[in-house]
Amino acid sequence: MLAARHFLGGLVPVRVSVRFSSGTTAPKKTSFGSLKDEDRIFTNLYGRHDWRLKGALRRGDWYKTKEILLKGPDWILGEMKTSGLRGRGGAGFPTGLKWSFMNKPSDGRPKYLVVNADEGEPGTCKDREIMRHDPHKLVEGCLVGGRAMGARAAYIYIRGEFYNEASNLQVAIREAYEAGLIGKNACGSDYDFDVFVVRGAGAYICGEETALIESIEGKQGKPRLKPPFPADVGVFGCPTTVANVETVAVSPTICRRGGTWFAGFGRERNSGTKLFNISGHVNHPCTVEEEMSVPLKELIEKHAGGVTGGWDNLLAVIPGGSSTPLIPKSVCETVLMDFDALVQAQTGLGTAAVIVMDRSTDIVKAIARLIEFYKHESCGQCTPCREGVDWMNKVMARFVKGDARPAEIDSLWEISKQIEGHTICALGDGAAWPVQGLIRHFRPELEDRMQRFAQQHRAWQAAS
C-alpha cells in the first residue's frame, strides 16, 4: 500500500505495511533521552581507554568489516537509508541519499570521499573528540563510506590548529595500513582504498565543502558556485562527496547493528544518536552522546549539572553552534533537540553545540562578538556578505553601548535579511541568524539600552 509522507518539504511515496490481523499499529515513541551505555557508539569519548588499534579492536571497531565490504555498495547504502541518518555537520541532509549520488557508472574518473574535519564553529568541539580519542572509528568509517560510493581514496581535511588530533589520526591510519585494514586489498576484500590527511591553515570558510575542496587543491579557500555539485565535479575535477566526521564515523556501527536499530532512536526523520557539546554557564561543561530528540532541559540538567545558579537563572541558549539563532528560557523549557523541533522553534540543530547563557550575560555584547567573528572570517567573495556583515558588525558595536535609535533595530533586521540567502555559501546566513534571534527575542533589551544611553547623554549635556 502506498502513502505520501512529507520529506524535506516535498512529498514522496513510501510503502506502508498494515497489520490487518490485530487492527492496531505499534504505538509511537513519545519520550526520548537517557541513552543506555550499550547503545552508545562512541565508547571512548573521554579518552579513558587506549585509542590505538589494540584498544579499538577491544571496543568492537573493525569487527566483521570485511563482511560489510563484501556485501557491496547497494547493501551499505540500503542500511544508511534505513537508518534515517541525517548529516551531522549542520545541514541535516539524508546521508544515504547523499552517498547514493556517487553510486553511478564510472566515466573513467576516480571518485573520492572528503571528510570535513575543519571544525571551526564557535562552541563546537565534537569532531575533535572523535579524532583524539576514537580515531579508528573515523578511519573505518572512511573505508565503509568509500565502499558505498565506489571511492578510490579518502581525504580527511583537518583544522590546522588541531595538532594533537591530527597526530593521533595519522598514527591510527598508519596502524590500519600495517594491519592490512586499508590500502591494497583492504581487510582482504579485494577493494583498494587509501586514506590521506590534509592540514588546513585555520580559515573558518574552509569548512564550506567547495572552499574545502579548493584548499585541498592548493588554491585559496573560497566557495565555488553550484552547480556543478561536488558529486559531479569535486576534488581534482572528480566526483566527490564531502561528509562530516561524525557522519562518517557512525556508518560502520550502523552497518553492524542494522539501520533499523539506529532508526529506533529519536523521532521520525530525526533518528539516531548524536554528540552534543554543552558549554557556557553550566556546572559541568561536557561532550555527551545522547538520543536525538532529547529535551534540551534534560540534556543540560542531566549531563552538564544544570545551569549555574539554577534553571531559573537561565537567560537564553544557542542550541546548535554560533550560527543558529538563540532561544529564550521560555522556549528552552519544552523544546526537543532535533532538526524539526528546533526549526519549529525558529532556530536549528546545526552542530548541536549548546551554548548556555545565564542572567549575568550581556546578551547584546555576546551576539556582537559572534558577528565580529563572522566579519573576520568572511572570504569577501560575495558583496552581501562582505559589506553586509561588516555593516552589521558596526551597528552591533553601537547597540552594545546603546548609541543608536530604536528605528535602527528594523534597519539591522533588514540588513540581515538582505544577506540571508543571497550569498554563494551559508556563512552569510550564519552571520545573519544570530542577529535575527537577538531582535526576535530581546528587542525590549535593545530599546531599554538605547533609552538609558539617551538619558545619560542628555544628563551629560545638561551638566556640561
Swiss-Prot record:
[4Fe-4S] cluster binds at residues 379, 382, 385, 425. GO terms for cellular component: mitochondrial inner membrane; mitochondrion; respiratory chain complex I. It is a peripheral membrane protein. GO terms for biological process: aerobic respiration; mitochondrial electron transport, NADH to ubiquinone; proton motive force-driven mitochondrial ATP synthesis. The modification N6-acetyllysine is found at residues 81, 104, 375. Its EC number is 7.1.1.2. It comes from the Eukaryota. Keywords: 4Fe-4S, Acetylation, Electron transport, Flavoprotein, FMN, Iron, Iron-sulfur, Membrane, Metal-binding, Methylation, Mitochondrion, Mitochondrion inner membrane, NAD, Oxidoreductase, Respiratory chain, Transit peptide, Translocase, Transport, Ubiquinone. NADH binds at residues 87-96. InterPro entries: ComplexI_51kDa_subunit, NADH-UbQ_OxRdtase_51kDa_CS, NADH-UbQ_OxRdtase_suF, Nuo51_FMN-bd, Nuo51_FMN-bd_sf, Nuop51_4Fe4S-bd, Nuop51_4Fe4S-bd_sf, SLBB_dom. The modification N6-succinyllysine is found at residue 81. Residues 1-20 form a transit peptide. The modification Omega-N-methylarginine is found at residue 257. Pfam families: Complex1_51K, NADH_4Fe-4S, SLBB_2. It is an enzyme of class 7 (translocase). FMN binds at residues 199-247. SMART domains: NADH_4Fe-4S. It is found in: Mitochondrion inner membrane. Core subunit of the mitochondrial membrane respiratory chain NADH dehydrogenase (Complex I) which catalyzes electron transfer from NADH through the respiratory chain, using ubiquinone as an electron acceptor. Part of the peripheral arm of the enzyme, where the electrons from NADH are accepted by flavin mononucleotide (FMN) and then passed along a chain of iron-sulfur clusters by electron tunnelling to the final acceptor ubiquinone. Contains FMN, which is the initial electron acceptor as well as one iron-sulfur cluster. Core subunit of respiratory chain NADH dehydrogenase (Complex I) which is composed of 45 different subunits. This is a component of the flavoprotein-sulfur (FP) fragment of the enzyme. Interacts with RAB5IF. Belongs to the complex I 51 kDa subunit family. This is NADH dehydrogenase [ubiquinone] flavoprotein 1, mitochondrial. It comes from Mus musculus.
